[in-house]
Amino acid sequence: MKTAVLSLFLALQTYARVTGSPSGFAAGTTGGGSATPAAPSSLDELVQWITDDKPRVILIDRTWDFIGTEGTTTGKCCSMPSTTVCSGGTSKGQAWIQDHCDGGSWVSCKYDNAALTPLDVGSNKSIVGVGNKGVIKGKGLRVRNGNKNVIIQNIHITNLNPQYVWGGDAITLDNADKVWIDHNKISLIGRQFIVSGWGKAGHVTISNNEFDGRTSWSAGCNGKHYWTLLLLGEQDYYTFQGNWLHDVSGRAPHMGTDHTKSQIFFHGVNNYFQNVGGHAFDVDTNTWVLLEGNYFENVNTPLTDTSLRAGGKLYTTSTVAAAGACQDKLGYICEWNRLAGSGAWKDRTDADVKTKAAAFKSSLVGHYPVADVPAKVVANAGVGKL
């Protein structure tokens, strides 16, 4: 018995720490730091550890299933012709959990309550999956109310009422700072894979994650999840690097809004967009977006037309001249973006983006050749690949 316990302890210690450290805007984030790593023994203990105010390194060494733990709701959801009925579509649609139904009709529905209320992550936390075993099912994570210094690494978040819009968000950032989201997988979510609230998300690095949009219920009626990333915060700096976004159909990502004092800088580097049955980037006002070394394969609309007229500033690096022109402000030659079997890429070289980026050059991560993106990203992004 003692030998078995010791073996388990040693196995956990192999994965007991965060792997690597964040680059980009979340550089310096330490999470639970030197706190003793530990795996919770019950759902109640998991919730307590994630939400309390103590520095912790929390090991997720199994599937923690929240489905059914807070009951279910049976009632009426809104069925919309374009997103729910899906006449002629290739998948089922999504009904809407909401209290109005203009232009639609009410239908009976039943959804799980746990997914509607995320776990509020306290400051100074590292939530780390063990090998490929770390799964949080039926509930998301939220960093808000001034909490900061959080690492979420090597976790699969899945099954948050995927058949319903507003069924749940996987990761929420609202009045937060210094968050590193790394080597996770997100799948089968009702609404957003990652969403910011109206407050600031702060300094965030989203790296090496797999956003898996394959689903039986799609608002795009095509078996691809629509609600991918919605970034709206008041004062946000995003490094988005090495992520694999596949089989999604929209908001991949959407950023910016004129409804708040939103100010967003977004550096997207070496991401792989694959089989996107709608649009990838959708950029609104009050944003500065630098895109380099991203690979778009079978993407209907890599960058929406509205992105060019909504007021945001973009540097899309689509020509040799644009790549070389980075050097004057940034001190390096940008990597161009590549398309394969995809819609047209829009050429924008707003100088304001380079000027903005030059103020924090130390937070701009390096790139590798865009031709290497598909193989490298698929090999590295997601759980169990640390």
Curated annotation (Swiss-Prot):
EC number(s) recorded for this UniProt protein: 4.2.2.10
Location of the protein in the cell: Secreted
Alphabetized UniProt keyword annotations: Carbohydrate metabolism, Cell wall biogenesis/degradation, Disulfide bond, Glycoprotein, Lyase, Polysaccharide degradation, Secreted, Signal
Disulfide topology: C77-C101, C326-C334
Enzyme class: lyase
GO molecular function: pectate lyase activity; pectin lyase activity
Enzyme active site: R251
UniProt keyword Lyase present: yes
UniProt signal peptide: 1-16
Coiled-coil zones: none
Biological function: Pectinolytic enzymes consist of four classes of enzymes: pectin lyase, polygalacturonase, pectin methylesterase and rhamnogalacturonase. Among pectinolytic enzymes, pectin lyase is the most important in depolymerization of pectin, since it cleaves internal glycosidic bonds of highly methylated pectins.
Family of this protein: Belongs to the polysaccharide lyase 1 family.
Name of the protein: Probable pectin lyase E
Taxonomic classification: Eukaryota, Fungi, Dikarya, Ascomycota, Pezizomycotina
